[in-house]
Structures are given as C-alpha cells and as structure tokens.
C-alpha cells in the first residue's frame, strides 16, 4: 500500500471558486496525491435552538461550500492528476458527491 498525502482545504475556500482552485493547484505543486473539501449545511450541523442563540455559529453559513462548485473542482483536480474528495456532513451529501469523489474520509 502506498502512502498518500491529501491536502485538507476544509472550509478555507471563502465561497470563492478561484480560491478553491488555487488550493488545488498548490496541492498539486507540493506533491499531494489528493485534495479534500467539506460539504455541510450549517442548519443540518447544529440544532435550531443552538442556531437561534449563537450568532457566531450562524455566521458559519459563510463556511459552506456551494454544491455547484463540486463538479468543476473535481474536474480541475483530476486534470492535475489529483484525487478529489469531499467529506459529507449530512446524509444526502453522499448522493450529491458520489459522481465526483474518488474516496470518502470517515472520522
């Protein structure tokens, strides 16, 4: 089994597709095997009563990766020879990601 290095972009994309692609490009340049994002919806990650009480948590909506980015990011990663992954944080995300990801990380 070969060792693989996967760059964790997480939520650092700033909801900006070019910034996301820049992370992918940098991952390729430093020799990573793959790149991983996260797909979550803040209203499914936290209970409604938590969201109602905590403005700083509601602001995390800005950390959501737009689902519309996934096909383009996957294609770009593959064009650079990288595997593409995105951790699903809600059940439907698995179906949404399936056509685009090479692997899932489960923690």
Regions found by a protein language model. Give the residues of each.
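Short, well-ordered coil/turn segments that N-cap beta-strands
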Residues: 1-5, 31-33, 78-84, 100-102
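N-terminal small/glycine-rich loop or linker at the start of catalytic domains
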Residues: 1-12, 46-52
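Conserved, mostly hydrophobic/aromatic
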Residues: 8, 27, 97
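Active-site beta-loop-alpha junctions enriched in small/polar residues
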Residues: 10-12, 38-42, 89-91
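Glycine-rich anion/phosphate-binding loops
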Residues: 13-26, 68
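Catalytic domains of carbohydrate-active enzymes, especially glycoside hydrolases
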Residues: 22-40, 100
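Glycine-rich, proline-tolerant flexible connector loops at the mouths of alpha/beta enzymes
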Residues: 33-65
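Catalytic beta/alpha-barrel core
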Residues: 60-65, 82-90, 94, 102-107
């Amino acid at each position: 089994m070969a060792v693989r290095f996967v760059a964790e972009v997480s939520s650092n994309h700033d909801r900006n597709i070019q910034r996301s692609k820049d992370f992918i490009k940098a991952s390729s340049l430093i020799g990573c095997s793959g790149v991983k994002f996260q797909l979550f919806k803040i209203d499914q990650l936290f209970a409604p009563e938590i969201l109602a009480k905590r403005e700083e948590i509601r602001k995390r909506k800005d950390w959501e990766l737009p689902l519309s980015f996934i096909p383009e990011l996957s294609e770009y990663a593959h064009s650079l020879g990288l595997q593409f992954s995105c951790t699903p944080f809600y059940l439907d995300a698995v179906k949404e990601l399936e056509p685009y990801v090479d692997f899932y990380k489960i923690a």
